[in-house]
Amino acid sequence: MNTFFKLTALAGLFAITGHAFAVDDITRVDQIPVLKEETQHATVSERVTSRFTRSHYRQFDLDQAFSAKIFDRYLNLLDYSHNVLLASDVEQFAKRKSEVGDELRSGKLDLFYDLYNLSQKRRFERYQYALKVLERPMDFTGTDTFNLDRSKAPWPKDGAELNALWDGKVKYDELSLKLTGKDEKEIRDTLTRRYKFAIRRLAQTNSEDVFSLAMTAFAHEIDPHTNYLSPRNTEQFNTEMSLSLEGIGAVLQMDDDYTVINSMVAGGPASKSKAISVGDRIVGVGQTGQNMVDVIGWRLDDVVALIKGPKGSKVRLEILPAGKGTKTRIVTLTRERIRLEDRAVKMSVKTVGKEKVGVLDIPGFYVG
């Protein structure tokens, strides 16, 4: 069911004492990487395809009809809201949808990479357009409507129709912030940061992102509970299943271009140091005997990979404390094996009338 929202009336540079942190804006489409399949992906594709076609409990033929279904799923994973690609883009690639099965068997995934690269280009164009729309005077006096769910809608037939969709999206974003009490300047500043951040994320995509999405489309078309796990996702899955990891015991999240401490595991290295607080930002990571690496603007999973390491090894963090006008400091932590107790089963006994009832709280499933 489509959802409509009725519109009615109603920094690249962050300066801190002693330091200046800057993340360059992406202003040209040639700054977005053209992604290509890596050597190992061909082998993995061949093996995954062989395993799925021979051993999956759901028997299927990887024929032209099934290939078309994988293509459609992949296309919708790339552009779920049908507001990035044009109808002509979709038509151009749809001519090749019957080739999907052959590409998966051979490991030569040209269609997946070509379509992904085009979607990256189109997404860059959309956010650049949105930034220009922000320069217009804001007007909430009309009775416009904005469709929040376009997953079943046709792709726009031309640039004018696509621009009209994004005019509505920007106005919806503006009004959403207006309803929180922000003034016009605050709204523009917030959305400018948001759209530029989205553009910078485009420049951080890599070949593994494309391959994982292609394999996910394949797996989910066979069965919604079948998944492909990339090496990094496999590591995360193993952590969740064992409820343990080797690191500093901190939960991180992104806030604009900063990696922020969201919470800390009690008894972990970060918590025990007393030198790190929730809300602090990690702006640099250094290994023993190596220079500090500036991680402002990095993908969160890349920052996490840099911080994690073997038990007993040391990691240096350049911490920018929460708040404005603060200076960075270096905190050295020794990595430990962290037990994720908050995700383990908890038991309690409740008194109900004259009876006692045992209650198990199961946050998730794990081994051991």
Model-derived regions: residue spans:
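Gram-negative bacterial Sec-dependent N-terminal signal peptides
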Residues: 1-21
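Surface-exposed patches in mature extracellular/periplasmic domains of secreted proteins
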Residues: 56-66, 81-89, 111-112, 126-141, ...
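N-terminal-proximal low-complexity accessory segments that begin disordered
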Residues: 37-79, 89
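PDZ/PDZ-like domain segments forming the peptide/carboxylate-binding groove
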Residues: 76-77, 98, 112-128, 138-172, ...
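Cleft-lining beta-strand/loop regions that shape enzyme active-site pockets
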Residues: 36-37, 53-62, 200-207, 223-245, ...
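Active-site-surrounding "flap" and adjacent substrate/cofactor-binding loops of secreted or lumenal enzymes
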Residues: 79-106
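Acidic/histidine-rich, surface-exposed loop or edge segments in extracytoplasmic proteins
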Residues: 24-34, 45-57, 95-99, 193-197
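Boundary at the C-terminal end of the N-terminal hydrophobic targeting segment
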Residues: 20-22, 189, 205
